[in-house]
Amino acid sequence: MVLSGSDKTNVKGIFSKIGGQAEDYGAEALERMFATFPQTKTYFPHFDVSPGSAQVKAHGKKVAAALVEAANHIDDIATALSKLSDLHAQKLRVDPVNFKLLGQCFLVVVAIHNPSALTPEVHASLDKFLCAVGNVLTAKYR
């Protein structure tokens, strides 16, 4: 997925609004994913997946860090997330559809907390960005 110049500007703009709340957004997105798509819990058998658990918050922090890293290196997401892609493809073997599900949950969280900032254009740009991140994370499955 190719991000245009305006997409990149929109993504960087929304991440600047998220700011120090990215970790909370990551945890909330995971909580939403677990509630909406309970089959995703199977990848976390050792986690307490209840809302607000320390393990969900810790993994939410990792999710947020990866998204921030991708946004900070938006011109080369593949290199920025290469190690994470290797981990998910070779060790964790997460079903690729789960990246799309988590991306949609993250988009919902951003919309809830930033309704005025998430214009249709920003929404489309963020969706394209999250799809690009998902594509990078699943590229090494092939």
UniProtKB/Swiss-Prot annotation:
Origin superkingdom: Eukaryota
May I have one GO cellular component term?
haptoglobin-hemoglobin complex
Question: Which residues bind heme b per the record?
Answer: H88
What is known about the tissue distribution of this protein?
Red blood cells.
Mention one GO molecular function: oxygen binding
Q: Which Gene Ontology BP annotations are present?
A: hydrogen peroxide catabolic process
Its recorded name reads Hemoglobin subunit alpha-A
Gene name tied to this protein: HBAA
